[in-house]
Amino acid sequence: MAGPATQSPMKLMALQLLLWHSALWTVQEATPLGPASSLPQSFLLKCLEQVRKIQGDGAALQEKLVSECATYKLCHPEELVLLGHSLGIPWAPLSSCPSQALQLAGCLSQLHSGLFLYQGLLQALEGISPELGPTLDTLQLDVADFATTIWQQMEELGMAPALQPTQGAMPAFASAFQRRAGGVLVASHLQSFLEVSYRVLRHLAQP
């Protein structure tokens, strides 16, 4: 029977492919895009920079978590996706952004709501492991900063609601395994969300 070192690359690839397939609907929503908006260029460039930073942080967390799952056989790909459903780990929609008629107010609102959601999901992963703690903390801060940037722009445009949203119920992880498996799914969902966000923002930043 092959050992962990032999099975690790195959399991890692299978897990990444399965997670990518489960995220495909989000990426498919990214076409086509409507005409560019009149959002300030400085705001859009700042957002693009923040997205790239979060993508780097998220990729680092995702790589460590997926590698652990593959190496120590903690997460079978199909079981991991089923666990995500049972734990109620949600997706953040961006349906108002990549469409023929871009809804600017709705898009900014969904960007902010999505970031706020992932901020809560990342907070739910606290205590996942001492090794991953610093990476998780950095990721939380960067997501919170990006959400603040979006909210401030909404306020400047008069699009912000009277009150900021409150965090809903987050998944409850009953074991260290569930927390690590949930971490893989949260990181994957966040990366898919950021891919679409980046594409939309880059389009809007075009002259």
From Swiss-Prot:
GO molecular function, one term: cytokine activity
Gene Ontology cellular component list: endocytic vesicle lumen; extracellular region; extracellular space; lysosomal lumen
Localisation per UniProt entry: Secreted
Signal sequence segment: 1-30
Keyword Signal: yes
Family annotation (PROSITE patterns): INTERLEUKIN_6
Swiss-Prot/TrEMBL keywords: Cytokine, Disulfide bond, Glycoprotein, Growth factor, Pharmaceutical, Secreted, Signal
Cysteines joined through disulfide linkages: C69-C75, C97-C107
InterPro entries, per database record: 4_helix_cytokine-like_core (IPR009079), GCSF/MGF (IPR040117), IL-6/GCSF/MGF (IPR030474), IL6/GCSF/MGF_CS (IPR030473)
Presence of the UniProt keyword Signal in the record: yes
Post-translational modification: O-glycan consists of Gal-GalNAc disaccharide which can be modified with up to two sialic acid residues (done in recombinantly expressed G-CSF from CHO cells).
The organism's place on the tree of life at top rank: Eukaryota
Any Pfam family hit: GCSF
Glycan-bearing residues: T166
Gene Ontology terms describing biological process: cellular response to cytokine stimulus; cellular response to lipopolysaccharide; cytokine-mediated signaling pathway; granulocyte colony-stimulating factor signaling pathway; granulocyte differentiation; immune response; positive regulation of actin filament polymerization; positive regulation of cell population proliferation
Summary of subunit composition and partner proteins: Monomer.
Role played: Granulocyte/macrophage colony-stimulating factors are cytokines that act in hematopoiesis by controlling the production, differentiation, and function of 2 related white cell populations of the blood, the granulocytes and the monocytes-macrophages. This CSF induces granulocytes.
Similarity remark: Belongs to the IL-6 superfamily.
Protein's name according to its UniProt entry: Granulocyte colony-stimulating factor
The organism of origin for this protein: Homo sapiens
Gene name of this polypeptide: CSF3
